[in-house]
Amino acid sequence: MSKSKFPFPGKSLALRELKADPCYVKIPPKERRGVVERAWSIGELAACDEYQKTMGSNDFRSIFEDRGVSVETRNVDYVVGKQRYFSDYLSGKNRVTLYEKSIRLWAEENSLEYENACNLILSHEYFHYLECNGLGLTSRIYQVPMLRIGSLSLGRTGIHALSEIGAHAFARTYFDLVNNRSSCKEGSARECR
């Protein structure tokens, strides 16, 4: 893969990802940017931690296998509504499913080799694995009422887009670390430069 090509949304597009979330309108405008920054930072810090733990490995199939997570491929173009899905991480089954036809379309659109595209998608899913196995769900760092009737609020829900923003940040930061475009500060796996 070209060292300059990275097909996931960057930090500058993270707010757009948040705007697409159905709960976006429930977040006060003055808090939106801060929520995005926090989710992005969680992904960056997790990437630094994992990069050091894996000693810079960039083979996410092997990283998953080392953690007892199976990676399966289904030969489908998985589209629901207007959304194309490339993969799923099922924590209860400890399995990642890759949707081959969807990935091939995405790889072609982004001038990527199929295996490189799979690895990038697996890096994104690895963040979701981390969320379910110690990191905590990024979608819950900010919660909004499920239902509001006048001044009465019922229930609380997280913001799914924050988890996706964290996963994009993880994949982006890990990619940059592997390609020597970023580094973790010495002595601290918790901070990236």
Tell where the protein language model's regions lie, with residue ranges:
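N-terminal leader/presequence regions that precede the main folded/catalytic core
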Residues: M1-S70
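Metalloprotease/metallohydrolase-associated module, dominated by Zn2+-dependent proteases
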Residues: K5-P7, K11, S57, I103, ...
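Long alpha-helical scaffolds
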Residues: G43, F86-D88, A167
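Polar low-complexity intrinsically disordered regions
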Residues: R61, V69-V71, V80-G81, L137-T138
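Active-site scaffold of zinc-dependent metalloenzymes
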Residues: E72-N119
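Short capping loops/turns at secondary-structure boundaries
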Residues: L112-S123, R156, H160, E164
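Catalytic Zn2+-binding segment of zinc metalloproteases
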Residues: N119-I121, E125-I141
